[in-house]
Amino acid sequence: MSGNQMAMGSEQQQTVGSRTVSVEEVPAVLQLRATQDPPRSQEAMPTRHNVRWEENVIDNENMNKKKTKICCIFHPQNEDEEECNHHSDDDGSSSSGSSSSESENEKDLDFNERRQRRLERRHRKLEKKRSYSPNAYEIQPDYSEYRRKQQEKKD
């Protein structure tokens, strides 16, 4: 093929004799459209979202408390399904009494009232002042004993 070819960005120029021809490449565009397939039958789709445990999930001490290494949060579809009576944030040392008496008193409350009390307990717990103590990554190990033993070996 006679002439020079050189690529510049998205344009290609080809020189033929004394004439230059520029060809511009148009980028390809992929357009996705939803199909008009009918929805699946009711047998294929579950009516409620339930947690299903596989056989390899461990039963925690025969208490029917399933544990996995993956943390997931279940979001109920209806407000009726949010009837949850456990409080994982409760530390049992609240100022108004024991956690069991609080839980018993909260059984008669609606969802918003229980939520409000749970938030109040969480705020009380976070407001408690703890003395600062460095974690394991912030503490510089003491190597003086190790160095002393190494020095004794050399002598």
Swiss-Prot record:
Residues 1-56, 79-155 are annotated as: Disordered. Residues 1-21 have a biased composition (Polar residues). GO terms for molecular function: protein phosphatase 1 binding; protein phosphatase activator activity; protein serine/threonine phosphatase inhibitor activity. The modification N-acetylserine is found at S2. One of its GO terms (biological process) is chromosome organization. It is found in: Nucleus. Keywords: Acetylation, Nucleus, Phosphoprotein. Residues 93-102 have a biased composition (Low complexity). Residues 104-114, 144-155 have a biased composition (Basic and acidic residues). One of its GO terms (cellular component) is nucleus. The modification Phosphoserine is found at S22, S133. It holds the Pfam family PPI_Ypi1. Its main location: nucleus. InterPro entries: PPI_Ypi1 (IPR011107). Changing W53A: Prevents interaction with GLC7 and reduces nuclear levels of GLC7 and SDS22. Changing V51A: Prevents interaction with GLC7. A motif (GLC7-binding) lies at residues 51-53. Interacts with GLC7, PPZ1 and SDS22. Present with 1080 molecules/cell in log phase SD medium. Regulator of type 1 phosphatases which maintains protein phosphatase activity under strict control. Regulates the nuclear localization of type 1 phosphatase GLC7 and SDS22, and is involved in the regulation of mRNA 3'-end processing. May also regulate the activity of type 1 phosphatase PPZ1. This is Type 1 phosphatases regulator YPI1. It comes from Saccharomyces cerevisiae (strain ATCC 204508 / S288c). The lineage of its organism: Eukaryota, Fungi, Dikarya, Ascomycota, Saccharomycotina.
